[in-house]
Amino acid sequence: AYMAFPLPGTPQLIAPSNVGPYYAKAAPRAATVEELHVIVRQFGEAAHRFQQAGGDGVEIQCAHAHGLLGGFLTPLYNKRADEYGGDINGRLRLTLEVIEEVRKMCGEDFIIDVRISGDEYSDGGLTLNDMIYVSKQLEKAGVDFIHVSGGNTIKRGSSMPAPGTAPAPHAHSSE
């Protein structure tokens, strides 16, 4: 799920907003800014534990409106009016803070890969142009790789062409 339990004993799932996916049994509540600070630290600590265990790097999942970071990035789930919502820069803020924390905890030689959807293929979702901008911001933040896929978990099959679709319907994404 794109939602998370930020702290042990948290009774309700949190998300960017109180908007949940179609498969959620109950609506989440919007994460507080204080919880987001804890989550950023937890990402850094988890990456550091992996590094201490011999790992060379991590992939941070922001694709498919899946996972907490993917939920924050998409306008389909993120309805916040604070610094973690609104325009693309606000919605990207949490991911950039996570990248910064991982770098701080693990150093410059630790590999950071970020997975994004190149296009969510959903009305009102992230577009190719949005994700070109996001990719440039991730590069500025010092990520080593950007893993691009497509679609989202909101509209099942959003990245799968309908039967009878002309060949290579997503070829425009490679230009």
Which residues make up each language-model segment?
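Flavin-dependent oxidoreductase catalytic cores
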Residues: 1-175
